[in-house]
Curated annotation (Swiss-Prot):
Its EC number is 2.5.1.75. This is tRNA dimethylallyltransferase. ATP binds at residues 11-18. Monomer.
Amino acid sequence: MTKIKIVVIVGPTAVGKTALGISLAKAFNGEIISGDSQQVYRQLDIGTAKATQEEQEAAVHHLIDIREVTESYSAYDFVQDAQKAISDIVSRGKLPIIVGGTGLYLQSLLEGYHLGGQVNQEAVKAYRNELEQLDDHDLYERLQVNNITIEQVNRRRAIRALELAQFADELENAETAYEPLIIGLNDDRQVIYDRINQRVDRMLENGLLEEAKWLYEHYPTVQASRGIGYKELFPYFVGEMTLAEASDQLKQNTRRFAKRQLTWFRNRMAVSFTAITAPDYPQVVHDRVRDFLGQKEKS
């Protein structure tokens, strides 16, 4: 089976994935698929660092603004949506470029999670329904029985981890349809932390506070409100923190998130990284993509 070539750009938040994705889309006749769990939500633009209108006009973007904030979204949903987007892009003779920092989503797509050729979908659904009927105590007992630990304990993550364990053999044998070129972006820790701090300041200047307040007043308990960029500001709205304290908390949580992202990509996806401050960084990446596609450099 001839596999579909796709480019995947990963790295910590604020590293510059969107800009690189647009650059590659222009150079290689590509379209971008967002691989971010929060950018699917309509009306949440600033806190999710969604591509701006100008950026979306510079390159076609998929899987942005496809859910209401009241809806849930999972790795399973992403794999289904991403597969459809990839098929659509390829059918028009273009290159799919996935840009995102949600490691589980990307790994699920690239390794055939749920949708691999040999995974029985009815069995997956039946097992998920069984897990959803369990109370929290029984669900976490299942985790212990299967020797599963998850970084952040909640029902959604617990069920997903148990599904992966239950169908591990099928997933290992499932044939993925894609041949990915994974491009990792990173730099010295202080460079990334400075970029994060500057981004948070820009977000606040551009209206993040108003966006977060709207979410807090209308939908404070939905899945979308638990994303970094919103929940840190909620204490400010009820007088438990000053704005400066909430801003510092947001920066700190984002830095911690960036560290977790890097750990995931290194351990789960074996990504090698390119430093964004290297003088030849853009050219090196473009050359890698050109070689991957078997193209010659234009004279």
